[in-house]
Amino acid sequence: GIPCGESCVWIPCISSAIGCSCKNKVCYRN
């Protein structure tokens, strides 16, 4: 539930390496 400061509209979350996932076009962690 914490925003990772990254969007995932066109590309996947690069921050997925630290546990972020795409939700509603924004990358979130928990």
UniProtKB/Swiss-Prot annotation:
Has UniProt tagged this entry with the keyword Kinase?
Answer: no
Q: In which tissues is this gene expressed? A: Expressed in petals, petioles, roots and runners but not in leaves (at protein level).
Q: Where in the chain is the Cyclopeptide (Gly-Asn) cross-link?
A: G1-N30
Disulphide bonds in the chain = C4-C20, C8-C22, C13-C27
Q: Which residues form the signal peptide?
A: none
Q: Does the keyword Disulfide bond apply?
A: yes
- Which InterPro entries does the protein's record reference? Cyclotide, Cyclotide_bracelet_CS, Cyclotide_sf
Keywords attached to this Swiss-Prot or TrEMBL record, sorted alphabetically, are: Disulfide bond, Knottin, Plant defense
* One Pfam family in the UniProt entry: Cyclotide
One GO BP annotation is:
defense response
Fill in the PTM field for this protein.
This is a cyclic peptide.
Q: What does this protein do?
A: Probably participates in a plant defense mechanism.
Free-text comment on this protein's domains from its UniProt entry: The presence of a 'disulfide through disulfide knot' structurally defines this protein as a knottin.
Family in the record: Belongs to the cyclotide family. Bracelet subfamily.
Q: What is this protein called?
A: Cycloviolacin-O4
